[in-house]
Design a protein with these regions (language model features):
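Hydrophobic, often amphipathic alpha-helical segments used for membrane interaction and targeting
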Residues: 1-97, 115-116, 128-130
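C-terminal structured interaction module
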Residues: 100-137
Length: 137
């Protein structure tokens, strides 16, 4: 989805900005507890189950269900997600306040960011499925 959204924005001549740089992404990965990563790899037999649950929640537009399916991933810790969500909020806020902006984030960030943006005075609604008809997944 990220790559397709990037292609659409480029094709339409839109300005594209990243909400974090490579070093910040690497720092997030470094913060993953090693045992959590090991447990995830040992649990590879359940990955098809997680994928199916994630797909079902995604297609149903079930944000809580979608967030629940990502908790198995090593990077889905409160510290990692919370720190990144605050960074995303700070960096997207000026553009959202200026208007005519779109911010794309992974599903693990949707619940926190929705609450944060509502605290900032934004009305947050589900995206119209028509947007996703342009994206080939």
């Amino acid at each position: 989805v990220d790559l397709e959204a990037w292609r659409i924005a480029q094709a339409e001549g839109k300005r594209i900005l990243a909400m974090e740089d490579i070093e910040e992404q690497i720092d997030a990965l470094r913060a993953v507890p090693v045992q959590r990563a090991v447990n995830f790899l040992k649990d590879c037999n359940n990955w098809p189950k997680y994928r199916k649950a994630n797909e079902k929640a995604y297609l149903a537009g079930d944000l809580l269900g979608l967030s629940g399916t990502t908790t198995e991933f090593p990077t889905r810790t409160g510290h990692i997600i919370g720190k990144r969500d605050q960074r995303f909020r700070e960096r997207m806020l000026p553009y959202l306040e200026a208007g005519n902006a779109l911010a794309l984030v992974g599903s693990a960030h949707l619940l926190n960011l929705r609450s944060m943006l509502e605290e900032d005075g934004f009305a947050v609604t589900a995206c119209n499925r028509g947007f996703f008809s342009k994206i080939k997944v």
